[in-house]
Swiss-Prot record:
Family assignment from sequence similarity: Belongs to the nucleoid occlusion factor SlmA family.
Protein name per its UniProtKB record: Nucleoid occlusion factor SlmA
Pfam family, one: TetR_N
Residue ranges the record marks as coiled coil: 119-144
InterPro entries registered for this protein in UniProt: DNA-bd_HTH_TetR-type_CS, Homeodomain-like_sf, HTH-type_TetR-like_transc_reg, HTH_TetR, NO_SlmA, SlmA-like_C, Tet_transcr_reg_TetR-rel_C_sf
GO-annotated biological processes: cell division; negative regulation of division septum assembly; regulation of DNA-templated transcription
Length: 198
């Protein structure tokens, strides 16, 4: 029984990896059908539906992976790092680095892969970025508590600016067919970002 469950889990993972790889390839710039996905995995469409009731559930699983990966690591950054600018830098690098290592998933993060899918999926991605923005805003607000001095500008405005930088780099990565890496020249960009915050 356990062996059958492992086989099923492995097949599910294989399907999700195939979908992510298709999103990374030139197929990702078009709608991915279950027929194309099944052919890529080497199974029938019926076999796909034994593991996932719909393509939407496949995207749900990938979004869940993105959420878990980013939010759990953001929580670790907040636990381990206390200095405001280091926290912000590490959170931005986390999001950009995750996207760089997972180009297919970046198409989901930018909404590009979800254009032909259910609106609910885009809503989940919107929520993810709202949660990241909320974490950035919280880090910015805590500076006043930690250092006794906050920022000149409103923390909500600054958090939006930081997130817009991230989203812009992800969009550029997808638009360039993954040629311009999100972390490219980050060390040169970081002082410019810090200057905007102060």
């Amino acid at each position: 029984m356990a062996e059958k469950e492992n086989t099923k889990r492995n097949r599910r993972e294989e399907i999700l990896q195939a979908l992510a790889q298709m999103l990374e390839s030139s197929d990702g710039s078009q709608r991915i059908t279950t027929a194309k996905l099944a052919a890529n995995v080497g199974v029938s469409e019926a076999a796909l539906y034994r593991h996932f009731p719909s393509k939407t559930r496949m995207f749900d699983s990938l979004i869940e992976f993105i959420e878990d990966s980013l939010m759990s690591r953001i929580n670790l950054i907040l636990q381990d790092e206390k200095e405001t600018f280091n926290r912000l830098r590490l959170i931005l690098l986390l999001v950009l680095g995750f996207a760089e290592r997972n180009p297919g998933l970046t198409r989901i993060m930018t909404g590009h892969a979800l254009m032909f899918e259910q609106d609910r999926l885009q809503g989940r991605i919107n929520q993810l970025f709202e949660r990241i923005e909320m974490q950035l805003r919280q880090v910015l607000r805590e500076k006043k508590l930690r250092d006794g001095q906050g920022f000149i500008h409103d923390e909500a405005l600054l958090a939006t600016q930081l997130l817009a930088f991230c989203e812009g780099m992800l969009s550029r990565f997808v638009r360039s067919e993954f040629r311009y890496c999100p972390t490219q020249e980050f060390d040169s960009r970081w002082p410019l970002i810090v200057a905007q915050l102060q």
